[in-house]
Amino acid sequence: MELTTPGVAATVAVLFGIVVTGAFHEDGLADTADAMGGWTPERRREILKDSRHGSYGVAAMCGTIVLRIACIAALAPAAAFAALVAAHTLGRGAAVGVMGLAPPVSTDGLGADYARSLTRSRTVTGVAGALAITALATGWWVGPFAVAALISAVMVAAVARRAFGGVSGDILGAVEQVAECAILVVATGLASRHPLWW
């Protein structure tokens, strides 16, 4: 017997993740989206440091929340659980990978502090750990999810390098959020074609 509807369950799952993390990554996504409205790298970096959220930031944050809820609600319970594990784990693994490999915007800030302490071996260990956890939850389907995380991380990092001159803590939050959304979209597509994809 189901206790509630898929939509309500998906909303609770997404909100629970936001509460547990303190909306840490959502805030980074919103700041990054706002900063993209600047005309020059210097202006974008200035906006990035502003903790207030503008229309771009709110739209990006709300859009990703709605997309995640819609994807999770479309999945069967077991598939939704596996997809959530993949999205949360590989999303953070993608952020670790970008943090360890991409140049920082500046030497100040939380992202720069973490990047200085993140050696190549720690980066590899973090990404490998994320892949291993996802493989335990999803089996061989870790492959498509890893590809989705990789493509989204490379795209966000490339845009950030061009727009800001590197990455920051906020941009790493954007990497994590975009990777989560990409993985959940892939999970929804797999579920529509392979009922036992997980």
Please describe what each predicted stretch is.
Residues M1-G22, A33-E46, D50-W198:
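Hydrophobic alpha-helical transmembrane segments
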Residues A23-G28:
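Juxtamembrane transmembrane-helix boundary signature
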